[in-house]
């Protein structure tokens, strides 16, 4: 981290103008730059191209050195569009990696990959900046305590609980609710934990980024009157950005989160939507950098790139970064190298199912596919563990019986199996929950359900005490008391209809 004596923008100081090169070749987002002998920039140094295009428009493009080619040439990846650049243009070596503003000044603001504000709310205090490339914390600094991170979402807290300071993956194909789940987590965590969040929008839709910002302003997560009281900093490198920006925007967000952890000694939440786009951007650039493609056309450096990002997301003795990452699964194939590489780094996986989404059960979290290293009796306690296992067993048995039901019907099942199916259907519906951020779509007010309430509810269903209630009563409710109240209401309505 660098403390700059004065607040200055990302411009280049006169000191750093000593090292000048010229553009030798441009292939899409990749530039080759020739430097004088003995004046080669280091790998990851930021280069700035300044000048005017043929129409006289001002050009200011920042690039990052990726390779030293020999013959006094370097190959760099542009962080913004290369429109208007021509061969022979002057390139300035800044002598350091990209640095971005960090600290309280970033809260409530939206940044791009370079740490420049893009929300039209004026300049940001850049006296404290930090380079985006750093080493992961040393082993001796790491914190190894286990504790649960309560989210207020029943299916998550019961069946695949999150670890404080852990890494969580949200897996799902297109349109099954990854972004809505992330928005709900930001909302719940800001309200229940009062923690600071950093949101990295990596290669996703600009519209979603805008919706998220508006939503945060409405819910008070971003305080427009006093930005310093906001609970989140936003960093966007959306779908329309060049691959260089999408490849580095995750590191920009992580750098801001690291400052809150290491200097402010806070517990931080880092949201990355979507980690697959980080890999995708790397693969777009990889071929242009002259690397041989690996399996399924991905970059050969896939594991290294992923590791260098993920190893920095961890808990230290000062504070923690709990990271929740949406993972787009291409063609719903979990064996694809991108999601498969991500799996290796995660403490918990929340898998979203298209089948459940089609049934209208939201959040569409697959209770049997989602996993967590925290679901052990010595960590969560015997009661929680037993309840979770019995819920899974009931749902698994229901899954096994579905073929028989489809062919022969429910009547052919034994009494015991029919009871299991009835309870499993209630459990399936009780795992749904109205979200605060989806109130406008569902018309139901959002619900935050504490862990103790969640366990109590599922124990009652499993014990058979609620066998007499209709399964519809368990759909889109908060705790179990709401389900019993809804059952009474449904009974009244049916009597009135008669």
From Swiss-Prot:
Which UniProt keywords are listed? ATP synthesis, ATP-binding, CF(1), Chloroplast, Hydrogen ion transport, Ion transport, Membrane, Nucleotide-binding, Plastid, Thylakoid, Translocase, Transport
Its EC top class is: translocase
Q: Does the keyword Hydrolase apply?
A: no
Binding of ATP: at which residues? 172-179
Describe its partners and assembly state.
Answer: F-type ATPases have 2 components, CF(1) - the catalytic core - and CF(0) - the membrane proton channel. CF(1) has five subunits: alpha(3), beta(3), gamma(1), delta(1), epsilon(1). CF(0) has four main subunits: a(1), b(1), b'(1) and c(9-12).
PANTHER family annotated for this entry?
ATP SYNTHASE, ATP SYNTHASE SUBUNIT BETA, MITOCHONDRIAL
Q: What is this protein called?
A: ATP synthase subunit beta, chloroplastic
**Which species does this protein come from?**
Carica papaya (Papaya)
